[in-house]
Structures are given as structure tokens and as C-alpha cells.
């Protein structure tokens, strides 16, 4: 019988270490999410920041950038923060702080919003408001799992009973869509906070497009970013800054991680 020590245990020290090592842009975006939750206690601020289709056309273009930061309550906010943090931290560690900041305050917010507005206004002719960072979670999951599907095309589910003749396999790239459907069902049953099926699907479309490389041109040129980083000495001046040139500096400006005989993977340090 396995001992208690063999099971994963919560460690406050490891959690504290993980939080203290979060890269800069991840910290900033999560801080803005929390700040919007505090400000959202006011109904006026909620209305100002939501993505409301007809309000956008009426001059509220800021809404296509503000809606991912806004949440309907504490449970909605904290659950999205917990789910978003590892995905956002990984993205920033792979692409750099400046690229992450530009994409998440720009195209990764505005492109899903534009798709949502087009469908709401011209196809369904509705005016349903949406808000929440779950659109970023779906976007990042879609891009990550699409990339993972190249090396692991299927995710194998364990047999619910040993007498079943075969295992069940799900296409790895389809998992975000399955999660979208499940969260929508659970939301309708009032088990989860309110979610937008259409909004999540718009986030998935942009995530898949990024994973396929169709919209990689949205990322700023690395040559320009290197010039800015070198000119301002961002890596040396700003704590937790991640350089865009990962091959040279590695994560947080240290040597690149390696799986070679003489190297130790960063995640095991």
C-alpha cells in the first residue's frame, strides 16, 4: 500500500517560490485583473468595461481591450486567475515579456472581440455582454494543445472498467472544444459562474490560428524588440523581465535549459 508521502502534497514553500518567480508581464496582467475586480464592485465600472456589442459601435472601442480583465465576482475572478497563471507564465517564458504584453493587450483581446461582435451583431442580432479572462485561457489552451498534438496526436482516457474491450482516445487538439462545451453545460446548471459559449469559441479560433502559425505576424519583429531591450537595458534594469532572445539569454536571463548529460532541466532545479 503506498505511503502518504508518495502522494502529491500541497507545499506553501513551493507555492511561494513559484509566485515569486512569476515573470513580469504575467504579474502585471494578473494585478490588473485583481484591480478590475475591486473596481468592478461599482456597477458603473462593470458597464464601462464589459464587451457590449452595441456599446462598442456607439463609441466604446475601449471595451475590446478591457473585457478580459473584468469579472462578475470573486469566485469568477480567482478561478480564472488560478487557471490562467501557469498558461500565461509559460507563454511569457517562451516569447518574452514585451511580446506577451503587446499580444495580450492587443490582438489576443481585440481579435476574439472582433469575431464576437461580428457574430453577435450581424449573424445572431443579439447584444449579449461578455467579460472575463477565460477567453485568454481558452486561447492559450487551444494554441498549446494544438502544438502538443504534433507529438501526441491523441490523449488516452483510462478505462472506466477493466472489462471494456478498448481504451478511449481523444484528439489532443479537440480537448479545448470539449472543455468549452462542458463549461457551458456546467454554467447552465449553475455549477460554474456564467460563461459565454460563443465568446469561448472565438477565443479558441484565435488560439488555433496562433498555433497553426497563421497569425504569428502579429508578434512584433524580434529585431526591433532586441534593439529596444538593448537600448533601454530592460533585462538588467527590471526584475523578472524575460528577454525575447531566449536562445541567447535563456529564461530570466540565465543559461538556456538543456536535457543533455551535463545539464539539468530547469523545471527540476
Say what each PLM segment does.
Residues 10-131, 190-199:
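N-terminal TM1-TM2 helical hairpin plus the immediately adjacent luminal interfacial "cap"
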Residues 122, 141-153, 182-189, 209:
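Short, well-ordered alpha-helical segments in soluble proteins
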Residues 122-127, 153-159, 216-229:
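A cytosolic-side transmembrane-helix exit/cap motif
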Residues 126-154, 168-172:
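Membrane-interface micro-motifs in multi-pass membrane enzymes
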Residues 162-166:
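A contiguous binding-surface segment within folded domains or other stable secondary-structure elements
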Amino acid at each position: 500500500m503506498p505511503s502518504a508521502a508518495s502522494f502529491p502534497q500541497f507545499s506553501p514553500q513551493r507555492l511561494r517560490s513559484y509566485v515569486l518567480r512569476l515573470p513580469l508581464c504575467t504579474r502585471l496582467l494578473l494585478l490588473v485583473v485583481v484591480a478590475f475586480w475591486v473596481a468592478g464592485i461599482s456597477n458603473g465600472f462593470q458597464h464601462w468595461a464589459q464587451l457590449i456589442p452595441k456599446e462598442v459601435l456607439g463609441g466604446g472601442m475601449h471595451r475590446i481591450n478591457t473585457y478580459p480583465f473584468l469579472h462578475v465576482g470573486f469566485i469568477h475572478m480567482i478561478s480564472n486567475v488560478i487557471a490562467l497563471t501557469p498558461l500565461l507564465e509559460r507563454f511569457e517564458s517562451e516569447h518574452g515579456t514585451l511580446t506577451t504584453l503587446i499580444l495580450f493587450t492587443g490582438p489576443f483581446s481585440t481579435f476574439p472581440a472582433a469575431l464576437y461582435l461580428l457574430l453577435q451583431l450581424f449573424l445572431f442580432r443579439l447584444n449579449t455582454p461578455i467579460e472575463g479572462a477565460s477567453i485568454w485561457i481558452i486561447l492559450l489552451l487551444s494554441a498549446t494543445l494544438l502544438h502538443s498534438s504534433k507529438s501526441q496526436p491523441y490523449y488516452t482516457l483510462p478505462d472506466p472498467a477493466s472489462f471494456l474491450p478498448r481504451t478511449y482516445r481523444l484528439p489532443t487538439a479537440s480537448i479545448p472544444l470539449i472543455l468549452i462545451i462542458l463549461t457551458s453545460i456546467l454554467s447552465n446548471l449553475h455549477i460554474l459562474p456564467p460563461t459565454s459559449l460563443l465568446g469561448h469559441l472565438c477565443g479558441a479560433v484565435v488560439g488555433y490560428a496562433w498555433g497553426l502559425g497563421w497569425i504569428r505576424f502579429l508578434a512584433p519583429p524580434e529585431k526591433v524588440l532586441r534593439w529596444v531591450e538593448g537600448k533601454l537595458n530592460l533585462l538588467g534594469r527590471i526584475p523578472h523581465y524575460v528577454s525575447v532572445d531566449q536562445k541567447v539569454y535563456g529564461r530570466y536571463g540565465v543559461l538556456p535549459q538543456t536535457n543533455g548529460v551535463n545539464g539539468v532541466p530547469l523545471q527540476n532545479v
